[in-house]
């Protein structure tokens, strides 16, 4: 399929951006017309975030609701493979090493984007990610799809069964639903380097109805961890304050950070 798609864009140079464990490939296409991105993945992927037809539906839905996202150029599938081609969104990822005097503005922009997304009309969102997502977690443990060597610090060294037991123990009784990105990490938020205004959201394949904590937990964790030392715990706290600290339940935050270990 990749060779066929390359023939559709013969004047572009293809640059491999990412090769995922689930068999998905991401390419950046340059050199002719607007810069494009092409995703190629199994038609029925192990990772739900690489269900490309679903991601295309989400991109179209977000665009209709005023959210800046990549424009879908082409989507399709054959018996075994799916593909999605989109226009690149201008801007720099919020995860980049911003100058110290700009970092607060970057974090504030992520919080503003989260609020904007969470204020979209729930009744109009056809994508659902309620607590039954724990069923997907169990499936991933059974099928050996959870990378137990890449767990965060607190559950490091746990078995899949231990993770599931903790998930059951800490599962919230109810959810207040909003429209969630599903993977609201700084690298999926793009900003204008000059104004620090949001230019777009990318990698929206996990966008669904869920509690706001599903997004807040991942964004705060990524801002706090040492892998991006130009941010850190103080900026994670700033993000939550800017979003609205009165909305934040630390137990739910911990649950959704744990849930992410399964995906």
UniProtKB/Swiss-Prot annotation:
Enzymatic reactions: kanamycin A + ATP = kanamycin 3'-phosphate + ADP + H(+)
GO BP terms: response to antibiotic
Keywords: Antibiotic resistance, ATP-binding, Kinase, Nucleotide-binding, Transferase
A GO molecular function held by the record: kanamycin kinase activity
Membrane-spanning segments: none
EC number(s) on file: 2.7.1.95
Protein purpose: Resistance to kanamycin and structurally-related aminoglycosides, including amikacin.
NCBIfam families membership: APH_3p (NF033068), APH_3p_V (NF032897)
Protein name per the record: Aminoglycoside 3'-phosphotransferase
Native species: Streptomyces ribosidificus
GN (gene name): rph
């Amino acid at each position: 399929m990749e060779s066929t798609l390359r023939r559709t864009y013969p004047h572009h140079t293809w640059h491999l951006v990412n090769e995922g464990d689930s068999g998905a490939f991401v390419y950046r296409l340059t050199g002719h017309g607007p810069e494009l991105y092409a995703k190629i993945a199994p038609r029925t992927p192990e990772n739900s975030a690489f269900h490309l037809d679903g991601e295309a539906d989400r991109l179209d839905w977000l665009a209709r609701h005023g959210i800046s996202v990549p424009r879908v150029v082409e989507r399709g599938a054959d018996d075994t493979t799916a593909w999605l081609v989109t226009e690149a969104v201008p801007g720099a990822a919020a995860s980049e090493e911003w100058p110290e005097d700009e970092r607060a503005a970057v974090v504030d922009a992520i919080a503003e984007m989260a609020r904007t997304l969470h204020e979209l009309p729930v009744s109009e969102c056809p994508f659902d990610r309620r607590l039954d997502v724990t069923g997907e977690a169990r499936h991933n443990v059974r099928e050996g799809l959870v990378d137990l060597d890449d767990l965060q610090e607190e559950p490091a060294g746990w078995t899949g069964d231990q993770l599931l037991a903790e998930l059951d123990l800490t599962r919230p009784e109810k959810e207040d639903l909003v429209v969630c990105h599903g993977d609201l990490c700084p690298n999926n938020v793009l900003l204008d380097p000059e104004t620090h205004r949001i230019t777009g959201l990318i990698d929206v394949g996990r966008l669904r109805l869920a509690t706001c904590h599903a997004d807040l937990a991942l964004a705060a964790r990524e801002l706090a961890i040492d892998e991006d030392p130009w941010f850190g715990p103080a900026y994670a706290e700033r993000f939550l304050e800017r979003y609205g600290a009165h909305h934040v339940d630390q137990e739910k935050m911990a649950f959704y950070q744990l849930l992410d270990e399964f995906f």
